[in-house]
Each structure stands twice: as C-alpha cells, then as structure tokens.
Amino acid sequence: MLKEWAIKQGILLKVAETIKSWIFFSQCNKKDDLLHKLDIGFRLDSLHTILQQEVLLQEDVELIELLDPSILSAGQSQQQENGHLPTLCSLATPNIWDLSMLFAFISLLVMLPTWWIVSSWLVWGVILFVYLVIRALRLWRTAKLQVTLKKYSVHLEDMATNSRAFTNLVRKALRLIQETEVISRGFTLVSAACPFNKAGQHPSQHLIGLRKAVYRTLRANFQAARLATLYMLKNYPLNSESDNVTNYICVVPFKELGLGLSEEQISEEEAHNFTDGFSLPALKVLFQLWVAQSSEFFRRLALLLSTTNSPPGPLLTPALLPHRILSDVTQGLPHAHSACLEELKRSYEFYRYFETQHQSVPQCLSKTQQKSRELNNVHTAVRSLQLHLKALLNEVIILEDELEKLVCTKETQELVSEAYPILEQKLKLIQPHVQASNNCWEEAISQVDKLLRRNTDKKGKPEIACENPHCTVVPLKQPTLHIADKDPIPEEQELEAYVDDIDIDSDFRKDDFYYLSQEDKERQKLEHEESKRVLQELKSVLGFKASEAERQKWKQLLFSDHAVLKSLSPVDPVEPISNSEPSMNSDMGKVSKNDTEEESSKSTTTDNEISRTEYLCENSLEGKNKDNSSNEVFRQGAEERMCYQCESEDEPQADGSGLTTAPPTPRDSLQPSIKQRLARLQLSPDFTFTAGLAAEVAARSLSFTTMQEQTFGDEEEEQIIEENKNKIEEK
C-alpha cells in the first residue's frame, strides 16, 4: 500500500513540474509578445501622427527618407480604426496556452477519479483561484500599460496639432501686421494715397501689443523646441549619420542667431532694441527660425521612435517602452505650446475682431451704410472692371511680344508652326477677362439705372432716356466675379511706389531744398532714405509681382514714341493736333517739349504711316478729315480719354508747341454723369478691343510709368509749368 502511494506521489510531482514549466514558458512568451505588440503599435501610431499632422518641412522629409526610409512607409501605412496599438479586447482574449492549461487541468481530474473526494476539492479550488488571480493581475497590468501608451499617443497628437495651429496663427498675425503697416504707409490696392511724411505713426507702433505677443510666444516656443532637440541628441544617441551636427540648427550658438534668444530673461526694452522696435523683418526671421526648429524636433523624434530602434524581445521591458522616452524628451514642451497658443490667440482676436465685429455699431452709422449699399455695388463693379482690364492688358502685351518674336524670327516654318497652338492657348486665356470686363460693365450700368430710377421716383420727374445706343442693358448670361474692396490679401496686392525715384539733390528739387534749414534738410534726407528702405522692405515681404525689367518693357511698349505713332486700324488719315495734357505730365514734373518736333515730322510723313494716332484732342480740325463717320469715331475716342484727364480751374493749361488751346469748358459739361462715362467705355465697332484698350490706358495717365502719386493743384507744379512756358516763348 505504501509502495503504491509512493508511486502515485511521484507521478503527481512530475505532472506538477511539467505543468509549472508550461505555465512559466507560456507566460514568458505571452508577456514578450504583448510587450512587443505594444511597443511596435505605439511607434507606428507616433510616426503616423507626425507625418499626418504636416509638421515637417520638405527638406526634413527628404532627410528622413535618406536616413531611415522605413519611417515613411510605416507612417503612410493604412491605419486601423483604433490605431496600431492592441485593444483591451485583444489583450483579454485567451491564447492557445491558456486553452492548453484548461484542457490539461480537466484531463488530470478525469484521470484521477479517486481524488474526487471532499477533502481534495479545497486543494484544487485554491490552485485554480491562485491561477485566476495571477492571470487577472497580469491582464490588468497589460491593460494599464496599453491605456498609458494610448494616452501618450494622444498627447503627441495634441502637441503636433498645437504646433501646427501655432504656426498658422503666427502666419495670420504677421499678415495682419503686414497689412496694417502697408495701409499706414499710404498704399492702397492700386495706387498711392498719401506720401511718407503724412503716414502718421511709425510702422512699428501699429499693433504693438500683437507684435510683442508674437515675439514672446515665438521666442518661448523656439527655446523649448531647441532644448528638447538637444536633450534627444545628448541622451538618446543614434548612428553617426543621424547625429551629424551639420543637420541641426539647435547646435548653432544663440549669439549667432541674435534677436535676444540667448537671454533667459529679457526685458521689454531689451527686446525692443534686439528686434529694431519689433519690426516686421525681425519677426519674420524669428518665425522662420521657429518653423525650422519645430520641424527639426519632430524629425529627430521620428528617427528616435522608428521601428528599427525597437529593442529585441528578450531585452524588452516595460521600462524601455517608447512612451517613457517620449515623456522624458518632451517634458514641458506640450505645456509651452498650449500656453503660447492661447496667449497669441487672445491677442490676435482682440486686434483682428474686437473693433470690427464685437463693437456695437451706432444706429446712425448703420443707416448710412444702408443708404450707400447700392453705391458700393456700383463701386465694386467699376473696380472689378478696372482690375480685369489691367489683367487683360498684361496678357495682351505678352501676346504682342510673342507675335513680334514670331514675325521677326529666322526659324524654319516647322518651328513657327509649332508656336500656333501656344498662340491659340494664350488667346483663350484672354477670353475670360474680356467676358468678365463686359459683364462688369453691364452690371455697373444696371446698378446706375436702378439708382436713376429710384432718384426720379423720389423727385417725381420723368426718367431721361440715355441717348447712347450702347447703354442698353443686356441680361447677364453667367455670374460675374466681383472683387470687393475690402480685406485684401497682402501677398496678392499690386503696389505702386509712393517714393519718388528722383534724387533729392537733382534739379527737380534743388531750389526748394536750398531754402530749407539744416535740420529740415537732414530730416528730409532721413525721411527720403527711410521711405526708400521701407518700400524695398515691403516689396520683398509682399512679393512684388512684376520685376523692374518687365515694368521697363511695359513702359517702352505703352509710352514710347513708337507706341504713340503706332496705328490702331486702317481708316482715313487725320492730321493730329497736339493733345493738351499737362495735367497728366504734371505727375512727373515735366511738360512735353517735343510737340513742335512731332508736328513737323508728322507733316512730312505719308498718309499710310500716320493713318491714326493714339492721342487725340477734342478740338480736332474737321476740315482735315475726309469722312464724317471717321470724325465721329475720333471725337468719341477723344471724349472717352478726356474723361480721365484731371481738370483744374486753377492750373493754366497750355501745350508745348505754342498752338492755340481750346477755350475753357464749363466744369459741368466736362464732368458728365456716371452713366454717360460708363457708356463711353463701350468702344466703337471700328476699334479693335486690344488697340482700344491700349489707347485707353495710354491716354488715361502717364503716371503709371513712374509709379508716382497723383496730386492736383500743387504750387510746385504750377511753377514748373510756368517755367516751361517761358522757355518755349524764348525759343
């Protein structure tokens, strides 16, 4: 009996040891497998977040592709619904080892029926309970670890989102500062409005609170991202290629960067001195440093969290999971991002929306805006017409250059024929502007008709029909794109210089310059230099669309002697009479002196050479014309151009050739109604649209060539005109 008992006891001990070894082996394998899944899942989620949030610059993406191509493939892989991390359900699901242990336990109970006694139930129950408790504790630890990894993954996503939101908000704030500075300098969308010495406040004094907030937040975020990147380089080194210091901005000393970044605590006065009064260029430089440093931080973090840097299974412990690395690296960076974002958002919303949207509008002001709404619609339509015509003129000039090159080229016929599709494409590009211009003109006419009908209804007078046949309102076939005169985007503005390019010591201003005191001279010189510097600065900031070479080419094409004598269409020749336009030339401080030379040269040329000219006067000699219909066409074109000449009762109008000028016309007759002016914009059928448009722009203002401000009635211009008249009389 004792012998049998000893044999049974030995069998039970062997079975227990086998079960114990199976349990330990299964738990180790299961633990390693779970840790590996959590590690890889967190790394994939982190890489996917960094790449999807678009916080990396293009050069950093290219560098990542060079150093570790697996990052891009892992980040761009198809993400699961709940991410790459294993879910709690998958962690709680029993694996094959758990099922094997259950079957072994049941088999043992079946094989030993003699142990089915009451005393043995307590032993087997305690063993089963201990196993279940151990299994539940390990499952709880794994679930807690999974929740922690999920939380840090969300923190990383929030940090990347805040970084991108902060960058976009700084860009908007800089645009608001830039737009306010441009407007304060006297710029409008098309032409200058006031000179530099009347600009009011210094540019850095505008939105000073927003400028300070931008500087403080950029400086704090830049320093936090720089310290985090340096910490990663020092405590978590990678290979030599990834740790190459030439690829990092954070290793550049603070003193070389300037802008007060080397100081831990900086006063407002010191920041004012370091940034030249919180100027726009200094803020833009600091913004570029922040963008580069932020992208560098996320690039290094992506290299550190790459799946290739995951430790092997036996060496992987909960202390080596990547969420601990992320927590150690970032430290106070998420808090800095969120605090700076909130501070800048408050300042930006205050300056951007408080005075315009959140301030209550007085009732009288609202009534005034209600009354002028229809007039604003007319202004919007006319302004849209002007911008479409300007764009159309640019396209036509480019097309004309292409045609001149094709005409004068010595290439073969095959190469020339290849250019025909390009010409067709350019003509198709012109068509939308032509249609838009026509639609804007029709819209303006319809709006003016509404105003006239409303005005006549109020006064009780019959409506006066328009005598111009071109005033017929045509219903719009397609909606017209109107360009509203509000809240423009500074990068898309076309600016004209309010700074005179003439040197201050030139003959143009020498007389007035000598009458000034020494302090006034120095002040005027400083203002002149400052205004030139600001102009160049604004051109570089806003992106000046047309280069100087292109503007010079436009000037030669539009206003050269060849362009003046260029024929528009083959009609009967008319002997031109000098156009009295000193008001347009007054912007340049000059009066045309070559009228007599043009008169003599034109008298010797043939009729084919001077079939038509671009400049016509209202008092053309009717005796020299051969056809009455052509006279009407020319008189109509002259009247159209006279609409844009600036009449001044105080300035004497005289031409340079000494010819008799037309008698002064009453001001009321020279200023027709808005409807008649709009009607005259519709050119005669005898004019081609391109030629008529070029003539219209050329006759309208010569100040476009010099990019100067138009001023009327100045004493300086009257003096220059009188001096030129005296010189002509002496000759």
Swiss-Prot record:
Localisation: Cell membrane; Cell projection, Stereocilium membrane; Cell junction, Adherens junction; Nucleus
Function in brief: Plays a pivotal role in the establishment of adherens junctions and their maintenance in adult life. Required for morphogenesis of the preimplantation embryo, and for the implantation process.
Record's compositionally biased regions (Polar residues): 577-586, 658-671
Record field: transmembrane: 91-111, 114-134
Acidic residues bias (residue ranges): 712-721
PANTHER family: VEZATIN
Broad class of where this protein is predominantly found: membrane
Subunit structure: Interacts with USH2A (via the cytoplasmic region); the interaction associates VEZT with the USH2 complex at the stereocilia base. Interacts with myosin MYO7A and the cadherin-catenins complex.
Alphabetized Pfam families for the sequence: Vezatin
Name of the coding gene: VEZT
Residue segments, region Disordered: 570-671, 710-731
Protein family per UniProt: Belongs to the vezatin family.
GO cellular component: acrosomal vesicle; adherens junction; nucleus; stereocilia ankle link complex; stereocilium membrane
Protein name as catalogued: Vezatin
Coiled coil start-end: 382-414
Composition skew (Basic and acidic residues), residue ranges: 590-601, 722-731
GO annotation (BP), single: cell-cell adhesion
